[in-house]
From Swiss-Prot:
Catalyzes the rearrangement of 1-deoxy-D-xylulose 5-phosphate (DXP) to produce the thiazole phosphate moiety of thiamine. Sulfur is provided by the thiocarboxylate moiety of the carrier protein ThiS. In vitro, sulfur can be provided by H(2)S. It comes from Bordetella avium (strain 197N). It is found in: Cytoplasm. 1-deoxy-D-xylulose 5-phosphate binds at G164, A190, G191, N212, T213. This is Thiazole synthase. GO terms for molecular function: thiazole synthase activity. Homotetramer. Forms heterodimers with either ThiH or ThiS. It comes from the Bacteria. HAMAP family: ThiG (MF_00443). Its EC number is 2.8.1.10. CDD domains: ThiG. Pfam families: ThiG. InterPro entries: Aldolase_TIM, Thiazole_synthase_ThiG, ThiG.
């Protein structure tokens, strides 16, 4: 793939279109090994669950995943109100020396981790007003995605299916509507389970995919990280190449019919 085909978010370009979470691995060493295998440059971190220095004496993720090597994307996993999400990302900015690229997620239900969109919209407005560059986990409702875009976020991140479900893209038609209307990067977030899921998202024209459980929950997370990298790259190349149109009857044989050698005796 051309080095000029880059993912651009908030004015910064990246070669990798696979964003990876840092949770649920057996330890930080495995986290780093999976990140290296995935080729990811942007890694997302749950501020409420991961030590970035706020707990001295405990293992610090930044010792294994340094900001000099990776772009950190602090997220608000575990937040159920706009106020909690905003406070969490203010803390992240302090811990990461003014870092302002963040992932907003405000959850509505602990059993399915579906986003609470009224609270998400409220938090997004506050964070944008405070100078954050906000990437947003959201539903696949095209209208609410447009509202987020109007607020001034830098990326739309609709779910493919429920977080951690591994069910893949359940509603490709809504995702298609979002892709057609959006002027921002659309990054599929949540629910992907296999490299083929990632490839489908990229073939549709998504700018990138983000995943955590699909890699960390695999029997061999390092091998799965490598597989996901290949799936994303294959899907992106297929999108750029332009697939053959679907049609019931081709009408034209794929092999030439002129100049055939006669079998008549």
């Amino acid at each position: 793939m051309s080095s000029q085909d880059t993912l651009t978010i908030a004015g910064k370009s990246y070669q990798s279109r696979l964003l990876v979470g840092t949770g649920k691995y057996k330890d930080f060493a495995e986290t780093r090994a999976a990140l290296d295998a995935s080729g990811a440059q942007i890694v997302t971190v749950a501020i409420r669950r991961t030590n970035l220095g706020q707990n001295p004496g405990e293992p610090n993720l930044l010792d294994y995943v340094p900001p000099s090597r990776f772009t950190m994307l602090p997220n608000t996993a575990g937040c159920y109100t706009a106020d909690d999400a905003v406070r969490t990302l203010r803390l992240a900015r302090e811990l990461l020396d003014g870092h302002d690229l963040v992932k907003l997620e405000v959850l509505g239900d602990p059993t399915n981790l579906f986003p609470n969109m009224p609270e998400t919209l409220k938090a997004a407005k506050t964070l944008v007003d405070e100078g954050f560059k906000v990437m947003v986990y959201c539903t696949d409702d095209p209208i609410q995605c447009r509202m987020l875009e109007d607020i001034g976020v830098v990326a739309i991140m609709p779910l493919a299916s429920l977080i951690g479900s591994g069910m893949g893209i359940l509603n490709p038609w809504n995702l298609r509507l979002i892709l057609d209307q959006s002027k921002l990067p659309v990054i599929v977030d949540a629910g992907l389970g296999t490299p083929s899921d990632a490839a489908v998202a990229m073939e549709m024209g998504c700018a990138a995919v983000l995943m955590n459980t699909a890699i960390s929950g695999a029997k061999d997370p390092i091998l799965m990280a490598s597989a996901m990298k290949k799936g994303v790259e294959a899907g992106r190349e297929a999108f750029l190449a332009g697939r053959v149109p679907r049609k019931l009857y081709s009408g034209v044989p794929s092999s030439p019919t002129e100049g055939l050698i006669s079998t008549a005796k």
